[in-house]
């Protein structure tokens, strides 16, 4: 983990207190806490966005019937508080604001642009053989050691990068190393693109404890279409994984590859409601 100074810790604690208030309260008190969060961001880190952006957020949080306020309520009510704080602080404060400032300084120093996020493949190995996937075509032998992963994230944090996407192969084949990495870098945010078949209660408990991991599950549509590409039984395994993640109140999404064969299905109300 990159070096963290006292002022940084104090600033992070301020944001955490306001986030706590938004999580614990409801209705008008929650909206008040979210307004305070916008005020705090504008006061301490306001030069990242223009005035119009802060006005937009105030308009959203002042209207209890806006779709975005309803979405915020769903997140704050349905996702575990530790994940809300971990992902919110790391993706927002560390990556979006503090990281942006550091990246701009590093850009001037080194004369190159610094990315906001980095995509890493911990392994080319996968437990599935999906039609058309490069992993099935090129083999399962390419690995990044834990030491390499740790070095990459440490060097990235020093440049202001705190957002990390992980694909593969299947990243959760390296489940233990990913959890170890997330624990070693508590101020970074890790987003995993996974087939979902290796997600279990033990993994979800660790994700809740750490607070800085969110998975996106690959899905091609309903069972028949999905399993045609990914293999028989995979759809039901994904449904079980989603049930487990919901039980533990994880933040997660889906990664959908749309084609001429499934685009109508994956954009249908029925499919989106299932998610």
Where are the language model's segments positioned?
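Radical SAM enzyme [4Fe-4S]-AdoMet core and its adjacent flexible, acidic
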Residues: 1-55, 59-63, 227-275
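Radical SAM/AdoMet-radical enzyme domain recognition
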Residues: 146-166, 172-275
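Conserved alpha-helical substructure of the radical SAM core
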Residues: 35-191, 197-202
């Amino acid at each position: 983990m990159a070096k963290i100074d006292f002022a940084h810790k104090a600033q992070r604690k301020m944001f955490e207190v306001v986030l706590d208030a938004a999580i614990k309260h409801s209705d008008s008190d929650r909206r008040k806490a979210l307004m305070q969060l916008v005020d705090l961001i504008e006061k301490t880190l306001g030069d990242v966005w223009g005035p119009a952006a802060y006005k937009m957020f105030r308009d959203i949080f002042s209207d209890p019937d806006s779709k975005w306020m309803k979405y915020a309520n769903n997140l704050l009510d349905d996702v575990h508080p530790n994940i809300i704080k971990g992902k919110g602080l790391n993706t927002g404060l560390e990556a979006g604001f503090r990281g942006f400032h550091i990246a701009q300084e590093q850009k001037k120093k080194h004369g190159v642009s610094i990315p906001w996020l980095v995509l890493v493949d911990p392994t080319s190995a996968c437990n599935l053989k999906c039609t058309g996937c490069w992993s099935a075509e090129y083999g399962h032998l390419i690995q990044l050691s834990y030491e390499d992963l740790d070095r990459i994230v440490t060097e990235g944090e020093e440049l202001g990068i705190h957002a990390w996407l992980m694909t593969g192969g299947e990243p959760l084949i390296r489940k233990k190393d990913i959890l170890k990495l997330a624990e070693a870098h508590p101020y970074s945010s890790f987003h995993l693109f996974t087939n979902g078949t290796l997600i279990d209660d033990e993994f979800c408990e660790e994700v809740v404890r750490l607070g800085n991991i969110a998975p996106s599950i690959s899905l091609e549509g309903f069972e028949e279409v999905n399993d045609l590409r990914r293999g028989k039984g995979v759809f039901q395994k994904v449904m079980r994984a989603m049930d487990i993640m919901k039980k533990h109140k994880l933040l997660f999404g889906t990664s959908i590859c749309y084609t001429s064969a499934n685009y109508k299905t994956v954009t249908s109300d029925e499919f989106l409601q299932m998610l």
